[in-house]
Amino acid sequence: MPQWFFQGGVAMYPLLLCSVVGLAIILERIWSLRRSRVIAPTLEKLIDAMPASGDGHEKVKAFSGGDRTVLGELIRAVFNHAAMAKHENVEAVQAIARQIVGRLERGLTTLSIVAEISPLLGLLGTCSGMVKLFVDVSQHGLGEPAQISRGIFEALIATVTGLAVAIPALVAHMYLRRRVELLVLEMERYTNELLARLYR
């Protein structure tokens, strides 16, 4: 660990934990939310090319049966409930879609907490450092200006670290949440398109 880490006080340890947790979530979500893992390009093309009747339905059904993407899961749900009335099928698929959205958003709440709590932890570290500095001044006097400056520097390390953890976490949270929204909208479009063609 660099020397400045230990100079920042006890708040640096929870900030280190926040940074590790935040980075792990960001990397995992970026990997999991790749478009190819959520929406298979082949399945997209099959749905777009699917006629109102004929073997196009069977091609989509056959491909989705072995497709491990999230869209494939939704499409299988549509076909699994195809014997139902359209509104019943829609309700069943919507219930599954809510579970899928929850999976896509996994970890984002924790990432939001990291972004919100890190500056507060930094501020706590700074406040505790300033209290320690004032206690030292009250007991030993002002001393050398360099000593006072060093004490203030050490107190501010925690705030700087808290912001350094919070800002990337906040940006990543906003980006990942927006990515989930766009992927969900796209999957909704393909699902609605399939439902419309199945129930013509």
Predicted regions and their residues:
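Hydrophobic alpha-helical transmembrane segments of integral membrane proteins
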Residues: 15, 111-119, 144, 148-155, ...
